[in-house]
Amino acid sequence: MAFLPVGSIPYQQYIKSTTPSLASYLKSIGYATYAQHPYYGSGWNRDTVYPLLGFDNLSFMQDYSNQRFVRKYISDETSFDRIIETYENKPDGQPAFIFNVTMQNHGGYTDTYYGFDNTVTADKLNNSALDQYHLADDHRKIPL
């Protein structure tokens, strides 16, 4: 991103054809390539771009079973379960590259969510946006 103009959206603006990537390289040496994102595939054009980057196997929110949520997003725990499931179901003996972009800590950070305690205790930290932007490591207390 350092070499792109301010405000660039690479997936939408620059990736229009097959583009070399870590995924395409690993695919070329025999890896199964998986891209996972527990949200809409149309977001940032992921459903179109991921194959251009060399990913053969895509999964988006509709593919996640037993969905658990933190705030309004599929939880990291659900996302990690999908990674494990993918790895356990890959062809025996085939290496796998599994790329996963999580959503649990995605903004907006100023909204209020039922059952979500957004309290963070730290000196000089009294901002609702910062309060929401924590790792939700205590998310199991949230009614799922």
Predicted regions mapped to residue ranges:
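Solvent-exposed soluble domains appended to multi-pass membrane proteins
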Residues: 1-144
